[in-house]
């Protein structure tokens, strides 16, 4: 029923719990890890965890697109390598995919960080508002949609960054559904760079995108 598609690049540190969280579900037909040229053994590690590995050129848009092309199921779920779905996620997915008209809608999970820092709680609220009001859930919230909808909107663009924003804008806010489940994402990048600085940079990158800057340029700024 469901293909899980995970883009990776040197992801051995956090990949095991991500795959473990979805592997046991009866809904999952396959787990595809689309690797962009890791040098840390990610490809071999993913295989040992039960995933089917596809080698791609680096770039998340490219990797997600390759994953969708190689997936065999009628439902696709795109998930970041450092994002872990909390128990109960499969119940919310089952309820979504069996609902009338679900094939023309896409679902995403509630964003949560694995950090007790008060900044993390504030950011989670900000993401919830961005998702609900603006209709802009990011890739670290997961994205669930039917193969037919994926094809109808043109699939993921093969761009290095903002592929998630580009995709959900084409799906349309009225067709996005908040699932009753939580996606817990690593807070490492916020801890390393500082919450405030990373949030400012994320907002700046989003602004650049809406102003028409190229994804390649935005990717350089994001780093």
Residue ranges with predicted function:
Residues 169-223:
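Hydrophobic helical membrane-anchoring modules
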Residues 76:
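Short aromatic/hydrophobic "clamp" motif used to bind/position activated sugar donors
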Residues 13-17, 40-49:
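Acidic helix N-cap motif at the loop->helix transition within catalytic regions
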Residues 35-43, 83:
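A conserved acidic beta->alpha catalytic loop
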Residues 29, 43-70:
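Conserved donor nucleotide-binding strand/loop of the catalytic core
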Residues 1-3, 30, 166:
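Cell-envelope/extracellular polymer assembly enzymes that use nucleotide-activated donors
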Residues 5-6, 10-24:
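Short, well-formed alpha-helical segments that are part of the catalytic scaffolds
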Residues 88-119:
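Conserved donor NDP-sugar-binding/catalytic core segment of glycosyltransferases
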């Amino acid at each position: 029923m469901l293909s899980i598609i995970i883009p990776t690049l040197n992801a051995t540190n956090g990949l095991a719990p991500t795959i473990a969280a979805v592997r046991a579900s009866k809904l999952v037909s396959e787990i595809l890890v689309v690797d962009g040229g890791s040098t840390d053994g990610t490809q071999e590690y993913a295989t040992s965890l039960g995933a089917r590995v596809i080698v791609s050129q680096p770039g998340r848009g490219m990797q997600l697109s390759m994953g969708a092309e190689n997936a065999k199921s009628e439902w696709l779920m795109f998930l970041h390598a450092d994002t872990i779905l909390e128990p109960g996620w499969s119940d919310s997915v089952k309820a979504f995919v069996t609902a009338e008209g679900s094939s023309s809608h896409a679902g995403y999970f509630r964003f949560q960080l694995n950090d007790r820092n008060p900044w993390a709680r504030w950011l989670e609220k900000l993401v919830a508002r961005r998702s609900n009001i603006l209709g802009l859930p990011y890739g670290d919230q997961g994205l669930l949609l039917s193969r037919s909808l994926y094809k109808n909107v043109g699939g993921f663009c093969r761009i290095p960054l903002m592929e998630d924003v580009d995709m959900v804008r084409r799906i349309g806010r009225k067709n996005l559904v908040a699932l009753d489940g939580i996606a817990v994402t690593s807070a490492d990048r916020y801890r390393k760079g500082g919450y405030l600085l990373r949030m400012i940079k994320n907002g700046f990158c989003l602004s650049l995108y809406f102003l028409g800057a190229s994804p390649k340029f935005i990717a350089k700024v994001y780093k």
